[in-house]
C-alpha cells in the first residue's frame, strides 16, 4: 500500500465531520478550509525544495530521504558523512604521477645540481700543483747556473782513488745550491794524510766556481801565506772579517752564493778560528748564512792512516765503507779540537793505492807532453814507498812526489 497524502487524509477527515454532526456552522467550515489550504501550500513548498535539491546533486551521491527517524548503525561506517547535506559534494582530483611541463619551453628532465665545493677543491688542487711545479723548476734553474755536472766530470777526470769523497761532495753541493735562502751556511771539512788530493780538490773547486759565479765571489785562503807569523794575527783577523763581509754582501746583491776555501787549517791561529766560527754561526744574521766554507787540513791524519790499514782487508770485500765508519770518530776528534768543526760535514780522504799513484803519473806526464809508457810509469811508481797490507800497497805520500818525479824526466 502506498503512503496516503496528508492533505487528502485531512480533507477526508474534514468532510466526514459535517456528515457525522450534520449541524456544523458555516464559520467553522471556512476556518477549516483555510487551515487545509495553508497546510497544502506548505507541503507543496517543501516538496518543491526537495525536488530542486535532488536535481542538483548527482545520482550517485543521493539517497532517498526517509521520513522515519534516523537510527545509527555500523553498516555504513566506512562511507564519508556529509556534514552539510544541502551543499553539493566536490570530487577530489587525483594526482598524476607524470611531470607536467610548460608548453612554452623545451621538455627536459630536471638535473640534480652538483655541489660547488667539488669545483673549488679541484681548483685548489690545480693551484697547489702549479705552485709545486714552479718551485721545482726554480730549483732546477738555480742549480743549473752552478754547472754541477761539469764539476762532476772534472772530479772524475782529475781525482783518483777518492770516489766516495767526490760523491759526497757533489751531494752536499746539490742539496745546498738547490735554493738561495738558507738557515745556515754549508761547511765542508776535508781531512786526510799528505798527498791524497785534499788541496787538489780545493783548487778544482776554486777554478770551477770562479768560472760560474765570478772571481770576486771565490776566495782561497792559505794560512801560512796570508798569516805567516803570530804578530800578523790581529791584522789578519780584521782583514779576513772585512773580506768575507764584502764578498757576502756582493753575493746578496747578485743573488749568488760565495765560496770560501781555507787550506792548511791545522796551522790557523786560534783567534782566527774564533772569528771564523762567529761568522758561520747558524743564529747569525742572514747576511752570512748564504755561503759555502771549505776547511782543508790534515788533522787526525795519523789515526786515519792506522784505521785504513787496519780495515783494508775488510773494506776490499765490500762489507764495510771506510768513510762511513771513520766519520763518527773524526767528528768527535775535531769537535774537541775547536768549535769551528761543530756544524761541518766531514769528508775523510783515504790512502791512495799503487794503481792510483800510477794514474797520477800518467795524468802528469800527459800534461807535460811526455808519452805515458806503461813500463816507464811502473818504474817511476816503484821508486815511491808503500804500506803493504796483504796484496794491497798504499803510498806513504800519495801523489805528492809525482810532480817532482816527472819534472826530472
Swiss-Prot record:
ATP binds at residues 192-199. It is a single-pass membrane protein. It is found in: Membrane. Residues 88-98 have a biased composition (Basic residues). The chain crosses the membrane at residues 120-136. Signal peptide: none annotated. This is Torsin-4A. It comes from Danio rerio (Zebrafish). The gene is tor4a.
